[in-house]
Amino acid sequence: MGNRAVLTTCMYEPKNSTTTSIYLHWNGGRDSVEAFLTYCKLKGYRPPETDCYGWARLCQVIGNFFGGSTSIGIDACCNLDCDNGDNGTYVIKNWKIVRRYYFKHKFEQHNHDLTEMLIAIDKAQPIAEQFGEDFFRAKEIPINELEIGNEVYVFDSLDCKYTKHKVVGFGTEERVNGLGRNGVSYVNKYGDAERGYAWNPNNYIHTPTVRLCK
């Protein structure tokens, strides 16, 4: 018994592939798997299809969530229970499900709300690596709606986490580090009141949306 699934990057006939893959004995439903993948994407982890570190980080996140000494395994895909009778095998790319094999049920599992699942996953991680519940409940808005004084979550690629900073200005026609920043909002992450913040390219927000701090 279980809620089994296999996750792989092999696009064709996974049960005959020697591609490194992982096995989930529990929480193999699509809603849980999408939450695990979304969490890794938010963390900025390298995708498994491009870097073995991606598999390591995915296993780390899922293993922390389950705890214990079972529930997750890693092996060549052909050695795993791909045609498991539960959720089959998910093919993943860039932290998204892009293909499915051996799924024989009419309906997908949708028992878990994505936000609540992300919060549960986050709480199971080491404290220093957690986003915090407020991050997941924060309102996400397009960057063209930002105003000076807004406090937002900004991704820190070195620590793979988000930190809070205030929007303090918008780029002008002057190029920064060789790139145009006209109209792009920037925050007070690197710099000070004397030098300002517009000079550092790492202060500019380049994502389509951003989360507002409460």
Predicted regions, residues:
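Mixed-charge, Lys/Arg-rich low-complexity intrinsically disordered regions
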Residues: 134-148
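Short beta-strand scaffold segments in enzyme catalytic cores
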Residues: 4-9, 90
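His-enriched metal-coordination microenvironments in redox/metal-binding proteins
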Residues: 1-6, 22, 26-32
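Short beta-strand-centered aromatic/proline hotspots
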Residues: 161-176
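Short, solvent-exposed secondary-structure boundary/capping segments
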Residues: 173-186
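Low-complexity intrinsically disordered segments
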Residues: 39-136
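Intrinsically disordered, low-complexity, charged/polar segments
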Residues: 183-214
